[in-house]
Structures are given as structure tokens and as C-alpha cells.
Amino acid sequence: MMKVKKLIAAGCAMILALTGCGAKQETPASAAKESSAVSSAVVNDAKESSMISSSAVSDAEGSTTASSVVSSEQSAESEKIKLTIEGYDKDNFPRLDGSLANEPLLLRMISDLTDTDADTAEVYLADSFVNGGTSTSWGKLLYDNMDLIISYEPPQEVKEEYVEMFDRLEIDPLGRDGLVFIVNVNNPIESLTVDQIRDIYTGKITDWSEVGGEPGKIRAFQRNSTSGSQTLLNKLVMNGEKTMEPEKDMLVGTMGELIESVAGFDGSGSAIGFSVYYYAEKMKSDPNLKMIRIEDVAPSNATIEDGTYPLVNDFYMAIRASEKSDSPVRKLRDWMLSENGKELLEEEG
């Protein structure tokens, strides 16, 4: 009997070795878990695949967008109107001058006429444009063989000095700009009336509390009497009244200096100054400054163009009246006064 039991035990051991008999058996629950794990792995793989596909799509879309932007910019550049005048090229171009705020327009004209980039055009323009300002440009056209100027209205002193000479010029309004008033961003004042500004610059109003601001002395910057912007102040604001004599440190030589002075004046926000819109907005924009509304109208291209902004004035293009009808200078003047010229002005802002 014992032999039989030993034989059975030996046989069972052999079977276990060969078949795994007696090993842990898989239950329906564990099978389900393994199946679920496999399914989850498949789902995760699918999700990763989807994410990769989405990323690829996003990359493709981004690439397409970037390409579209570049293409749009290139298209816009190619669609710009081109100023070409027979007789002008990079070896023969006009001598141009004007007000500082008109320098970008003059550069564009030289760039087009010489078919060069802006940097090269700046070198060409430097031969005639010496940044002497509004009054200087009128004198240079009369006496210095300047071909053409684009400038703001000449100051009264210049008109009186050259009163008989202006008959020798052909002067045409070319565009419109606005006289704007700037204060430090820390100044709570948002709007002033023309009367209030006049009273500030005559010295009748001396404290910001008199115009709704916080108590503090008003420090009003001015420019010299022959500058274009001071001329606009006298014409558009002062109404025949004289501006007060500025303190020594309140009188600055250039528009750039005025803007820098107002922006940085002792950090108190008590300063006020003025400029023309194009220069203050496009050429010398400063995050420490803000333009205030006049009669509650903010200066902008639109409000200056339609005249709803109260302080607007033309700027001018002038040549000598003696220019022959077929001269390149006169052809340039005529082109700038045409519809093409208006389009170029709009492109330059």
C-alpha cells in the first residue's frame, strides 16, 4: 500500500513539473483585469497618437500662419505706391528739406526716387536736410537753392522777414496735422479746454487744482518763437494773446527735448508741453507720456483728418515759382499733389 502511495506521489510530481499542475489558476476576475489593462494601454497609445497628430497639425497651422504673415507683409510691401519721376535716380535726386516731423515723408520720397533702402536714403537726404526746423527750411528754399520743402506754416517773424520773397514761391497744402498737449502719465488730468490751455500759457492758471487736477504748480514748457510747434500754439490757441515769459529751464530748443523734459520732469507729473501729433505719436513716442484730450476729443489720425479734433492745421509743400513746367522738381510737386501722392501720404500715416 505504501508503495502505491509513493508511486502516486512521484507521478504527481512529474505531472506538476510537466504541466504546472498545482500552480495558481487564473480566475475570471484577474483575466478581466488583464484585459482591462491591455485595453487601457491601447487607449493611452491612441491618445498619445492623437496628441502627436494634434501637435503636428498645430505645428503645421503655426507654420502656415507664419508663412501667411510673411506673405501678407511681402504683399503689402509690394502693393505700396511707388514714387518715380523721370530725371531722378540714385545719381541725381532732389534737395529736400522741411520740418522735423516731415522727415519720414522726405525719406520715403528719396528712397523711392533713388530706389534704395531707408538707411541709404537717409544718407542721401542728409546732404540737404540739416534738421534746422520749420523757419530754416523756408529760408533755405528762398536762398540756398533747395529744390522742394515740406514744412509747417512759417512763423510770423519769417513771414515778415520774407514778405516780398514769398511771391517767388508756389505753396500748396499737402496734409494735415494736429497740435497736441502732453503730460506725464502720473498726471490725473485727462482733458482740457482750449481756454484753459490759453490761460495756462498766459500765466492766468498756475496750479493744476484750478483745472480739476491735484494741487501743484503747473510747469509749462515752451519752444522758441520761430519753431513750427510754437507757431501753431500762437495761431491755434493763444488767439492774439502773448504767451508768458517761460522760466529758463522751461524753454527748450527742439521737439525731442521738450518731450523728454515733460516725460522726465522731477517725477511729479506737474509738467505740460506740446508737439505735433505725428512726431509725438510716431517718431518720439514715450511710455511716460500721455496726450490729453482737447474739448474732450482725443487726437488721432481720424479726428485730425475729419477736423473734430479742435487744434488742426495744414502743412505745406513749396517750390520756387521759377521752376520750368517740365522740370523734375515741378513733376515731383505735381505727383505729390495727385491721388497717388495722397495714397503715399496715407501709407506714411
Regions found by a protein language model. Name each.
Residues 28-78:
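Intrinsically disordered, low-complexity serine/threonine-rich repeat tracts
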Residues 7, 26-27:
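Small/flexible residues
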Residues 18-20:
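C-terminal motif of bacterial Sec signal peptides marking the signal peptidase cleavage site
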Residues 14-15:
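Repetitive helical segments and hydrophobic/amphipathic motifs
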Residues 2-3, 37, 62, 116:
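Disordered, low-complexity tails and leader-like regions
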Residues 22-24:
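Bacterial signal peptide processing site
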Residues 42, 66, 70, 74-160, ...:
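Exported/periplasmic ABC-transporter solute-binding proteins
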Residues 1-11:
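Bacterial N-terminal signal peptides that target proteins for export
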